[in-house]
Every structure is written in structure tokens, then in C-alpha cells.
């Protein structure tokens, strides 16, 4: 590995270091750093939030002078420990090495391992016209022709993603299934259903169950739910990170992990005859921020809006005006971040993708109107204003000829648009088959027994955390579902009290559409179906993001679903008692009393 000097302070600057937090900028690189002094001990880090790369400033609420606050999402870092304190118990900041040289200068050093893509380097060869072609299908799905091989990224081409919350914005080319069947290999970046689409893969498996599919070796396996999905795929290959995988003499690829969500997110470098294609997909900080520069083509997400925050929140600061301003500000920050990233990496060509979804179900009209997305053309114009990078806003069926574009970006045949009259945007979606699957869970025998609540949350395995959550089943419009469950879970001791405990505790209310929450519970699915799919409405007091709780239910649930067959057998043996929770509100603020009725 190599050692890089990031910042050098003169003896005078060292002598003037104050106790506590010191901010510095390297004027030659424009990079920012934080140095914390506690008597003779010094700790240092980059001034960059690990969440989404925001800049830290002094936290005026911290009278002890140990923490800094991110200007993006108000995350807080205790620089004395290098641990994030908001959200609590989440990430640790990467530290820099602090050294004094022989001239009493202070150096901030970073130890860098060699870039894996630089191993066995290959010089770019000239590409023939038509030799490398990239065709956009929809959302994050690209069809790559690489010599005599074909590779497809993240095929989501039919059905919804995240239960019923996301639907395709673009109409895929009519030959999409043929294209998938002709692929030599498929790369699926991560387990989210806008990338790992079981409805799409079911169609493909009916024709080519043995098609080679490649995924990264993430902590949460990409295909963790394959057996339960009923999709018959027989050639899934789990690859180590940072190692070239040779496809033929001209083609190889390398999968890399995300620096913020290494347990699930990946990105990929594809290289053909020395020309690199970088696809960072949804990674928040792909490969920890270390990426190849001057690749032939780079593609990444751009749109924003892939979260229930803040649209699904209410109470306190979450007024419609606050939400609108927050969303507007966040989208602008994301645009600027992506533009900076592209400027720094200097690809020859950049393509924004993986953001073309819409909340098209009529019941999600509010989300659709509120959750505005970034315009890819606005991002591309921003990039072109600050760099010489060529940009491509893709339309379904459009094909980029890499050889032509690298040789002459003005070549009219460099990008072939779909024929005149081709349908670009979807105007209808086949809702019913997918909603029927969700609705089937509502009347399942499991939910005749109120003891499913204890069974489910015991299976989930999250406890020893001071948080009380009220779960409320609702109809389409988030009104209480007639006869639905409304109950408390105290995660400190994993109990299910009739009313909130007397001790001090954070509190959340989660209103969930009954069809989705019961489908998730029955099948042991991750809560991204609820949260990212906009199937909940939330309130919290205090207004704190509980990272450990959400991270557990979004990524760390058991790999096998609850054993409901055994549960029902136990219910039969214990008698026919069928219990239902009902709620009576008291005059006491934020305190709910629960009664239990035996309905047998």
C-alpha cells in the first residue's frame, strides 16, 4: 500500500491548535479535514460524513465541544471517539494517521491499498464501430453488447418494486425478454426489488433457467429469498470483491462493494479490450470513494426519492411546507454531488440511470405529487457546464455505440434513438395480479391468532434497545383497518404491553397498509417493502432516526421466514382462543391503553 500526505501543518499552526475541534482545508486540493485535540492526544479524519458525503460544521448544541453536525442530514459525529451519535450506534468514522516529522510539522496521512482494477492492466485498443453497444431498456437495466458476448445489468422489466410502491416509468422495448434470453451473463447489483425483480426473473427462468447470473458476496445474500420466490434459477454465481473475473480474452469484470452499505450494495467495472465501463448503481459511496478515473463510460443513479423520508412522516416539524423545502434542497444537493463526482472521475461519457420509477397506483397520488425526482437533463447540463464529459440521457431502446462516441462524439450514429413513434413512457400498469398476491395475506389463518405478534417479533430477533413502537394496521388511505391489529412492542425487553411504559423511552408510531404488512410478516420479508415502498405513515418522538432498529428490519432479519406451520399447530393444541387488540385513547398525551378481548 502507499502512504498519501493529505495535509501538512507548520510548527506555528501546530502550536496554535486549540483544545477540542479544529477545522482545516488543504488549499491546494480543496479537501477538508477535522483534527481533535485532547491535551497531548490528537485524532483526525476527513471532513466528510460517512452517510452521503456531506460537510461537517460545529455542532452548536454540543457544549462539550466534541461533536460536529453534517450539513446534509444533520448526522452527528463525536470526534473524540470517531463514533456517530445521531443516529445512535450506527457508523464509525475512518481515522487518518497523525504523525510529526523531523521538522516538527504535523502530517495527516492516509494508507491506501493498491487499486484492484490496476492489477494486470490492459491498454485500450481501438474499437470497431458496432463492436461495443449499450442499449437502455428501463430504470437500471442495460443490455451490453461486448464483442460477441452480451451482458445485462439489473433486469426489472415487469411488475412493481417494493411491494406496490414503485412502478416502471419507461415502457421497455417489446423485445426485452428476447434480449434477456440472449444474454451470456447477467449482473444483479443488490437485493432491492427494482434490481432483483422476481416477476422479471420468473419470465426469464421459464425460458433459460440456467442463464449465468453474477452477484457480489454481500453479507446479506442477494438471492437470500430465492427458494421462497418459486423462481427456478440454477446458475447463480457469488463472486468475491475486487478480483477480475475473465469472461473471454477481451472481456472481464470486477464487482466492488459500497462503503456505506457493504452488507448489501455493490457496483461493477466491466472492461472490454482495455475500455472500462463503471456502473455505480445505487451505491452511496461506491468502493469507499475510490474509483477508476477516466473510464470510457460511467453510469449512476441520480433521481433521489428512493426513501419514505420525509413524505411518509407527520407530526412536529413535518409540515407540507417543510417537506417540500427539504425535498427541493435534497434533490439539489444530490445533483451537485453527482456533478462533482463526475467532474472528479472524468469519464469520457456519463449516463444517469436507475431512477426512472413512478408511484403510479392511484392510492399513492400524494407520494407521486410530493416525491419529486431530479431531471436527468438538468444533471447532464450541470456536468457539461463544469467539464468536457459527454452526457447521455437514455430513452428505452436507445443504443450508444462506444467505439463511435470515443472516436467522434459528434458522430450522428454514435447514439441511435428508438424509431419515431416509439412509446417512451408507460401510461398503464397491470396492478391487479400483484395486488392480489398481497391481498391474499390479509385473510391468512395466521392472523386469526393474536399470538402471531409475539411469534413474529421473537423471530425477528431485535431486542435490548430502548424503543417502543406502536404498530397500526390500516386501509388504503391509512385509516385504521376494521378489525385490524393495533399494538405496542417494547424492544427493551421484547414485551407487548397494554400501555406505554413509565420509563423514559423513544416512541414511534408506524401505520402500515394491512395487505403489505401482513404479506411482509407472513413471508419474512425485509421492511424496505414497507418503508421504501411508501406503504407506511410514521410519527416519532423524539425526532431521531433509530439506525439499529431500522437497519435490523431492513437488512438483518433471519434468512428463513417464520415457521408458521409450527405456529398454527401450537395454536390448535392450545385451543381455539382468537384474540384481538383494540385501542382506547386516554387523555394522557402520547399514551395509549390497550384492552384484550377473547373473541372465540
UniProtKB/Swiss-Prot annotation:
List keywords of the entry alphabetically: 2Fe-2S, Cytoplasm, Electron transport, Iron, Iron-sulfur, Metal-binding, Oxidoreductase, Transport
Q: Which reaction does it catalyse?
A: CMP-N-acetyl-beta-neuraminate + 2 Fe(II)-[cytochrome b5] + O2 + 2 H(+) = CMP-N-glycoloyl-beta-neuraminate + 2 Fe(III)-[cytochrome b5] + H2O
Role noted for this protein:
Sialic acids are components of carbohydrate chains of glycoconjugates and are involved in cell-cell recognition and cell-pathogen interactions. Catalyzes the conversion of CMP-N-acetylneuraminic acid (CMP-Neu5Ac) into its hydroxylated derivative CMP-N-glycolylneuraminic acid (CMP-Neu5Gc), a sialic acid abundantly expressed at the surface of many cells.
According to its UniProt entry, the protein's GO biological process terms are: CMP-N-acetylneuraminate metabolic process; N-acetylneuraminate metabolic process
Annotated cofactor note: Binds 1 [2Fe-2S] cluster per subunit.
Family per record: Belongs to the CMP-Neu5Ac hydroxylase family.
A Pfam family recorded for this sequence = Rieske
Q: Which cofactor does it need?
A: [2Fe-2S] cluster
Asked if Oxidoreductase is a keyword of the record, the answer is yes
Q: Which GO terms describe its cellular component?
A: cytoplasm
Per UniProt, where does [2Fe-2S] cluster bind? 49, 51, 70, 73
Taking every annotated instance into account, which residue ranges of this chain make up the domain Rieske? 9-107
In which compartments does the protein localize?
Cytoplasm
Q: In which pathway does it act?
A: Amino-sugar metabolism; N-acetylneuraminate metabolism
Q: What is this protein called?
A: Cytidine monophosphate-N-acetylneuraminic acid hydroxylase
Name the Enzyme Commission number(s) assigned to this protein: 1.14.18.2
Q: Does the keyword Metal-binding apply?
A: yes
Q: Which GO terms describe its molecular function?
A: 2 iron, 2 sulfur cluster binding; CMP-N-acetylneuraminate monooxygenase activity; metal ion binding
Amino acid at each position: 500500500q502507499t502512504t498519501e500526505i493529505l495535509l501538512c501543518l507548520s510548527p506555528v499552526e501546530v502550536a496554535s491548535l486549540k483544545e477540542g475541534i479544529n477545522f482545516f482545508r488543504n488549499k491546494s486540493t480543496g479537501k477538508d479535514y477535522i483534527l481533535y485535540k485532547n491535551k497531548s492526544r490528537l485524532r483526525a479524519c476527513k471532513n466528510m460524513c460517512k452517510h452521503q458525503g456531506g460537510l461537517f460544521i460545529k455542532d452548536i448544541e454540543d457544549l462539550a465541544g466534541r461533536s460536529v453536525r453534517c450539513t446534509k442530514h444533520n448526522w452527528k459525529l463525536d470526534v473524540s471517539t470517531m463514533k456517530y451519535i445521531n443516529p445512535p450506534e450506527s457508523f464509525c468514522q475512518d481515522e487518518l494517521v497523525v504523525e510529526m516529522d523531523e521538522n516538527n510539522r504535523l502530517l495527516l496521512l492516509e494508507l491506501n491499498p493498491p487499486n484492484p482494477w490496476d492489477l494486470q492492466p490492459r491498454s485500450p485498443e481501438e474499437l470497431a464501430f458496432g463492436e461495443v453497444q449499450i442499449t437502455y431498456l428501463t430504470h437500471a437495466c442495460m443490455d451490453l453488447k461486448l464483442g460477441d458476448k452480451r451482458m445485462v445489468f439489473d433486469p426489472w422489466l415487469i411488475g412493481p418494486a417494493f411491494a406496490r410502491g414503485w412502478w416502471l416509468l419507461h415502457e421497455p422495448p417489446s423485445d426485452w425478454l428476447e434480449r434477456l434470453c440472449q444474454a451470456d451473463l447477467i449482473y444483479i447489483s443488490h437485493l432491492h426489488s427494482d434490481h432483483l425483480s422476481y416477476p422479471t426473473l420468473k419470465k426469464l427462468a421459464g425460458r433459460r433457467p440456467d442463464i449465468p447470473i453474477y452477484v457480489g458476496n454481500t453479507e446479506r445474500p442477494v438471492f437470500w429469498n430465492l427458494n421462497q420466490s418459486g423462481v427456478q434459477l440454477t446458475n447463480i454465481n457469488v463472486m468475491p470483491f475486487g478480483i477480475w473475473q475473465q469472461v473471454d480474452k477481451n472481456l472481464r469484470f470486477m464487482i466492488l462493494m459500497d462503503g456505506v452499505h457493504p452488507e448489501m450494495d455493490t457496483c461493477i467495472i466491466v472492461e472490454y479490450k482495455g475500455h472500462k465501463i463503471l456502473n455505480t448503481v445505487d451505491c452511496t459511496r461506491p468502493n469507499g470513494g475510490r474509483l477508476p478515473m477516466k473510464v470510457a463510460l460511467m453510469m449512476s443513479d441520480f433521481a433521489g426519492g428512493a426513501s419514505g423520508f420525509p413524505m411518509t412522516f407527520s407530526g412536529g416539524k413535518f409540515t407540507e411546507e417543510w417537506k417540500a423545502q427539504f425535498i427541493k434542497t435534497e434533490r439539489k444537493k444530490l445533483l451537485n454531488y453527482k456533478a462533482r463526482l463526475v467532474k472528479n472521475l472524468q469519464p469520457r461519457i456519463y449516463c444517469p440511470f436507475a431512477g426512472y420509477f413512478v408511484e403510479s397506483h392511484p392510492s399513492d397520488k400524494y407520494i407521486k405529487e410530493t416525491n419529486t425526482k431530479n431531471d436527468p437533463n438538468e444533471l447532464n447540463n450541470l456536468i457539461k457546464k463544469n467539464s468536457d464529459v459527454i452526457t447521455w440521457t437514455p430513452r428505452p431502446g436507445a443504443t450508444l455505440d462506444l467505439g463511435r462516441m470515443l472516436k467522434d462524439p459528434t458522430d450522428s450514429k454514435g447514439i441511435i434513438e428508438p424509431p419515431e413513434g416509439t412509446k417512451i413512457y408507460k401510461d398503464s400498469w397491470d396492478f391487479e395480479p400483484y395486488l392480489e398476491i398481497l391481498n391474499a395475506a390479509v385473510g391468512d389463518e395466521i392472523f386469526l391468532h393474536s399470538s402471531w405478534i409475539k411469534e413474529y417479533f421473537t423471530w425477528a430477533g431485535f431486542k435490548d434497545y430502548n424503543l417502543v413502537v406502536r404498530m397500526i394496521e390500516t386501509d388504503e388511505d391509512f385509516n385504521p383497518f376494521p378489525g385490524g391489529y393495533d399494538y405496542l412492542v417494547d424492544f427493551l425487553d421484547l414485551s407487548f404491553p397494554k400501555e406505554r411504559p413509565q420509563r423514559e423511552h423513544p416512541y414511534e408510531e408506524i401505520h402500515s397498509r394491512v395487505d403489505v404488512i401482513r404479506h411482509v410478516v407472513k413471508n419474512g420479508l425485509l421492511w424496505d417493502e414497507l418503508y421504501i415502498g411508501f406503504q407506511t405513515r410514521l410519527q416519532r418522538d423524539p425526532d431521531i432516526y433509530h439506525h439499529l432498529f431500522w437497519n435490523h428490519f431492513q437488512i438483518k432479519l433471519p434468512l428463513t421466514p417464520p415457521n408458521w406451520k409450527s405456529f398454527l399447530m401450537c395454536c390448535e393444541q392450545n385451543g381455539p382462543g382468537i384474540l384481538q387488540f383494540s385501542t382506547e385513547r386516554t387523555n394522557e398525551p402520547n399514551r395509549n391503553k390497550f384492552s384484550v378481548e377473547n373473541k372465540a
